[in-house]
Amino acid sequence: MTYEIGDRLKIGGYFCTIKFIGVIKPWPSVKAYGVEWDDHSRGKHSGTIDDIHYFDVQIPNSGSFLKESKIKSPGVRRITFYEALSEKYGGSSNNINDLSIGNKRVEGLGFDELNARNKNYKKLRKIALRDSDVAILFQNQDELNRVIQNCVNVKDLDLSLNLFTNINSLCEFIEPLKNLESLNISQNKLLSGWDNLKEYDLSHIKTLRLSSCGLSYKHIGKLLKSFRTLKMLDLSYNNLTSAGIQNFENEIPCTLEELNISGNNLISFPLFPKNLTLKGLNVSNNQISRAPSIAIYSVESLDITDNKFKERSLIDDLNKTFPSLKNIHLSGNEFNYNGNYINVEEQATFYEVLARFDRVMVLNGSICDVKTRREAEMFFVSKVMNNELSYDTNLPRWSSLIKSYEIDMSKLSFNNERETRQSLVLKIKIRAGKKPSSDLDYWVLPSFTVRYVKSVICRKLNFDILNVKLFHENSEGMINEIKYNFRPISDFNVVNGDIIHVSSPVNNKSIQKVNSPS
């Protein structure tokens, strides 16, 4: 097989791109191939050896030279789509005759075997050829016609992690496959064919996955002219920037319902057309630090995991700009309050974040029922009214909350006087030893079960929940064990300021002393 500059190879399980073919000074008698490795750690230099520069690389020290014997070893393959299809779905045959025309091997099949194989192909609805060394989609029109004939019923095609590079050939290949709806070409380096890319009728494709293809917005803009009725588009981990992606407003199909642009270089949300029907948006693993400037009414699911959101008030901005939001992932952002980092997974913060949104019922993957949401809202309202949480009470969300819980704001003042507070939550002290100096303050709802309170305490103190007992001490110093894991703590007359003693094998003796009669 003859190789050209720009060809992709997989050698020993590692992918690379040929950047140079010729003779180099250290190997004057053999043909050398300069390659750039996808796994940059395998490189040894940047295309320069003995002070002679032979080729350029995108990432410093990601290049190396290989002898032709290494490149043309039996384990290095570049095959056609039809060959890969035959290997995986064609089955074995005892009626194959090996013929040779020049240097090309031709597979000869009996008519019965050929008809049976073609019949099997036509039954296929999904073809999965991920990592199958496919470098050539078709060699000529006859081969393309054979693919069209045999893959007529295919709806889902996975060609991810292969070796083809020409985008024009790819579009020409899939255009006649009119039943094809889902196409995955992720992790292919689409390096060529962009300059003469035609407009194709690829309106039958509804799902397109282009993750990790090294694409810029310039490439995406050209490609979307052919994919005009997409419902799902995955552009994650490419080379998209906020400057380029702002043009999405003019390029993105209005039919799109789900968009994944995670893992790029975005510092802001893209602009979208007003008539967009987008339901799901994933912008995780970017550098975004603020909400969109224009409301996006259609989005119901949003993933902003691992971005640069820092201020708590940005949660309220997201609620305003995504008014239909029902599902949000926002872990990995350094939300803070008074300079302190907030862990969204902590129960109190989880409740607060949930309550700040009008309609969210799934937070960081946790599905919340109506009861949980109501508890979160009660907790949040009480914290705000107790001046324990800074919140803009002029927001429409606050008006909605006080209306929902029939709170007469004219009878309340926001200060620290206990008599003005509404006791929707209880502040208790957790004591795991004899000394009050070790007490931990904890906010609970009266509806929290004993088991839930126990689990939170054990998580904070690193205790084993199976070996822990809780004891309630009221304001008069009376101590009683809290039993019945699935009853609410309100059943045990726990009120503000009470102490919950924790008994575990580590501190069991000290707790027994607390419980001893005087």
UniProtKB/Swiss-Prot annotation:
LRR repeats: which residues? 153-174, 179-201, 204-227, 229-252, 255-276, 277-298, 299-319, 324-345
Q: Does the keyword Repeat apply?
A: yes
Question: Recorded GO terms, molecular function?
Answer: alpha-tubulin binding
Keyword Repeat attributed? yes
Spell out the InterPro entries in the cross-references: CAP-Gly_dom_sf, CAP-Gly_domain, Leu-rich_rpt, LRR_dom_sf, SDS22/Internalin_LRR, Ubiquitin-like_domsf
Q: What's any one GO cellular component for it?
A: cytoplasm
Positions of the CAP-Gly domain = 23-67
Protein localization: Cytoplasm, Cytoskeleton
GO biological process terms, alphabetically, are:
microtubule cytoskeleton organization; post-chaperonin tubulin folding pathway; protein folding; tubulin complex assembly
| Keywords assigned by UniProt, alphabetized | Chaperone, Cytoplasm, Cytoskeleton, Leucine-rich repeat, Microtubule, Repeat
Something else the entry says is:
Present with 2140 molecules/cell in log phase SD medium.
Annotated function = Required for viability in the absence of the kinesin-related CIN8 mitotic motor. Seems to be involved in the assembly of alpha-tubulin.
In its UniProt entry, what is this protein called? Protein PAC2
Source species? Saccharomyces cerevisiae (strain ATCC 204508 / S288c) (Baker's yeast)
